[in-house]
Structures are given as structure tokens and as C-alpha cells.
């Protein structure tokens, strides 16, 4: 009904390739075997046909049960993948990349894992959670540029493994965990103190206007690397670090980050263009405490304008997603869209609030919501507009 496909992960920590094979057999094999017949007994005559499988999750993380070294994981993932393909050769598999770019083994982990699994996987995973522990808004809005770096580094590593094999195969990227998340990470706020309550509130991050801007920057980073990032999963969707909040027996409302996500989904369809951006820049230092020590990442020459351009060849339309990272000044934008002949503005919206700590709530669900963007000038291939300070904006032209 929702028009989606599942992505399932097998357990390669406390379990192994045999358990992975059995799970796939249960899901995808037509019948006549122990596990497929068990599925049929459970009421599902036809196979589920799950095509996308993750070979474990964050296996480099010491918080995982039976975390692995890169060699340990790589060997186990290779054997699991081999056995799974014997059951269903049509599946697509993702190997675990580093749990974060700040992990001590980052880089070497990807290299070693892919040297083991290259012939058996289509993807390697990436995870990122943006934060503003330092209370530095400018750095927070610049940190999606580190996502760009992360993606480009992993692509380079994957392609180096291919080059060593003299292979034309290209490993794609599965950015299967990403979001803004930091307030509820440290407080372990909802740990069960006594008993086993049903559905207690857990990790209910309340998102601000500021968060929506950083989130929008992450959306742009993903779109601008659509040639290699072939799947990207927001973690999570409802209540737990989520764009949608609910109350038991009560209201449901959209958090601030809902809007960039919804607009990326609606307008980010077509062909991602390689836009050349000429913008004033600023320098920042991003703080990320992930790992055993504090990590400070310099971000040099972050452009105030972060932009993604999407062409819809069917309608000959052009969609622009733009982030103005200047905290106090509007940004005049001129786009030269070579070959574009559109004459009308289909949609023009901006997400902006003078209070960057503004939030949505059950009492005020539309406190932060898209508003109409100001006048847009269309003159042939030249498009002119002005972005409010600290804003996320979407323009659709046809």
C-alpha cells in the first residue's frame, strides 16, 4: 500500500552465514523446504521476495554484541553472502562500512572488508548523525559538507579495491542510517528503571528550525552524490528521532525536519545535475564526540549557498533545493540553467524562522512550516531569486 520495499539485515554478530541463509530461505524460497514451509504455515503462501539485504549492522562498533575486526567481519560476510546467493541469486547485498567517519578504524575498515567481499556485494554502508553539541550554529550548518567528504572518500576506497582487481565493477553506497541526533544520545533518558513498560517514550528528539537546516543540507549532499549513493534511509520515522511525532490517544504532528525530507522526496525525482556553485564562503570547526576521544573537524570554505538541481526530462522541468547558511543576511541567487526553457514557477517555498530554536508541537504543529518564497524572475535560461537568512528553500520550474 505504501509502495515501498523492505531492507532487512541478517545477524552476523552472534549468528553466522547459516542463520542468514535460513532467514533468506524463509522469506524468499517458494516452498518445499523447512523454512519456506514454515512461512507458508504462518499464512504467507507466496514468498516475500525481499531483494535488499544488509550483511550485519555496525559490526565495527564495540556497542554491538560480538563486534568484529575488519578481517573477522569480512570473512564472515563473504561466506554469508555466498550461501545467501545459492538460495536466491537475484538479491542485492550491502557490506557494513564504518559506523561513523570518526571511528578509529575508518578507511582501513572499508578497504579490508571490500577486499574480502567485493565479488559478493553491490553496496557498502555509511552512517552519519549530525550534531550540535558545541552550540555552534554556523559549524552545524556546515557539517553536511563532511557528508560529502565521507561519501567521496568511501567511493575512492571502493574504486581502489576495484582497480587492484582490474575490475570495471563499481560498488555503490547505501547511506542506510542518517539524521540529526544528539540531545537524547547522552542522557540515556528512557532506560527502564523497573518492570517492563509497553512502548515507553524512547529517544524522542525534539527538532528545531536549526536542525531542519542542517537536515536539509544532508538532503542536498545525498542528492548531489546520486551517481553512487543508491539508497539512503532516514533513521527513524515516527517518535524515535523522527520527523513525525504522536501522542497515545492524542495528536500527531510534523517536526521541523519533516519538511526538507518531504520536499526532497517530492521534488528530488529525475536526474541530479552537477551544479557549479560560486558563493561566498566561511570557515568552521565541527565538533563530534563520537568515539573514545573528542574529534574536531575543520571545514574550510563552506559556501553559504548549498544547492542541488534536479532535471525532470519527462516534463522538462527543473527543481532547485537550496540552503542559505548565512545566519543574518539574505542571499541573492542567480542560476544559469543551460538548455532550460521553462516559463512558469510551479512551486516556490521556503522554511525560515527568525528563532532558530523554534519547534513544532501538538499545541503549535505549524510553528515551523514552509511559506511562499518571494518573487522569482525567469528570463530565458537565467533565474533570479532571494533566499532569506538561515533558510531552506525549494523552487520548481516548468
Regions found by a protein language model. Give the residues of each.
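Extended catalytic-interface subdomain
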Residues: 122-131, 136, 140-161, 167-185, ...
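C-terminal beta-sandwich/jelly-roll accessory domains of carbohydrate-active enzymes
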Residues: 280, 285-302, 315, 323-398
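Aromatic/acidic polysaccharide-binding cleft in carbohydrate-active enzymes
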Residues: 168, 173-305
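Flexible loop/turn segments at secondary-structure boundaries
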Residues: 14-18, 60-63, 100-105, 130-136, ...
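Short, surface-exposed beta-strand/loop micro-motifs that present aromatic residues
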Residues: 303-313
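Conserved, mostly hydrophobic/aromatic
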Residues: 23, 53, 93, 124, ...
Amino acid at each position: 500500500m505504501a509502495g515501498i520495499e523492505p531492507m532487512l539485515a541478517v545477524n552476523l554478530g552472534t549468528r553466522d552465514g547459516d542463520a542468514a541463509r535460513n532467514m533468506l530461505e524463509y522469506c524468499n524460497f517458494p516452498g518445499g523446504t523447512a523454512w519456506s514451509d514454515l512461512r507458508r504455515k504462518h499464512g504467507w503462501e507466496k514468498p516475500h521476495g525481499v531483494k535488499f539485504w544488509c550483511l550485519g549492522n555496525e559490526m565495527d562498533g564495540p556497542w554491538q554484541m560480538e563486534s568484529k575486526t575488519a578481517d573477522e567481519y569480512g570473512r564472515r560476510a563473504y561466506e554469508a553472502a555466498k550461501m545467501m546467493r545459492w538460495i536466491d541469486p537475484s538479491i542485492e547485498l550491502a557490506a557494513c562500512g564504518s559506523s561513523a567517519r570518526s571511528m578509529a578504524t575508518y578507511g582501513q575498515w572499508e578497504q579490508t572488508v571490500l577486499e574480502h567481499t567485493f565479488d559478493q556485494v553491490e553496496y557498502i554502508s555509511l552512517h552519519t548523525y549530525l550534531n550540535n553539541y558545541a552550540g555552534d550554529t554556523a559549524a552545524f550548518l556546515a557539517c553536511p559538507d563532511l557528508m560529502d567528504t565521507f561519501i567521496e572518500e568511501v567511493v575512492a576506497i571502493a574504486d581502489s579495491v576495484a582497480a587492484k582487481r582490474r575490475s570495471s565493477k563499481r560498488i555503490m553506497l547505501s547511506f542506510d542510517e542518517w539524521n540529526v541526533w544528539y540531545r537524547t544520545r547522552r542522557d540515556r533518558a528512557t532506560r527502564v528503571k523497573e518492570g517492563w513498560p509497553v512502548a515507553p517514550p524512547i529517544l524522542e528528539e525534539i527538532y528545531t528550525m536549526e536542525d531542519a537546516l542542517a537536515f536539509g543540507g544532508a538532503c542536498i549532499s545525498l542528492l548531489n552524490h546520486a551517481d553512487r549513493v543508491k539508497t539512503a534511509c532516514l533513521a527513524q520515522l515516527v517518535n524515535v528521532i523522527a520527523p513525525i511525532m504522536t501522542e497515545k490517544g492524542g495528536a500527531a504532528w510534523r517536526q521541523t525536519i519533516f519538511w526538507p525530507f518531504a520536499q526532497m522526496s517530492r521534488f528530488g525525482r529525475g536526474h541530479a545535475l552537477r551544479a557549479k556553485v560560486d558563493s561566498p564562503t566561511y570557515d568552521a570547526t565541527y565538533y563530534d564526540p563520537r568515539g573514545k576521544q573528542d574529534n574536531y573537524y575543520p571545514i574550510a570554505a563552506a559556501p553559504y549557498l548549498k544547492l542541488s538541481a534536479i532535471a525532470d526530462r519527462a516534463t522538462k522541468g527543473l527543481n532547485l533545493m537550496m540552503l542559505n547558511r548565512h545566519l543574518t543576511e539574505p542571499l541573492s541567487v542567480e542560476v544559469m540553467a543551460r538548455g532550460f526553457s521553462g516559463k512558469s514557477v510551479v512551486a516556490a517555498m521556503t522554511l525560515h524562522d527568525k528563532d532558530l530554536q523554534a519547534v513544532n508541537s501538538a499545541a503549535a504543529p505549524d510553528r515551523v512550516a514552509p511559506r511562499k518564497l518571494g518573487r522569482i524572475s525567469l528570463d530565458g535560461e537565467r533565474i533570479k531569486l532571494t533566499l532569506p537568512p538561515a533558510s531552506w528553500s525549494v523552487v520548481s520550474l516548468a
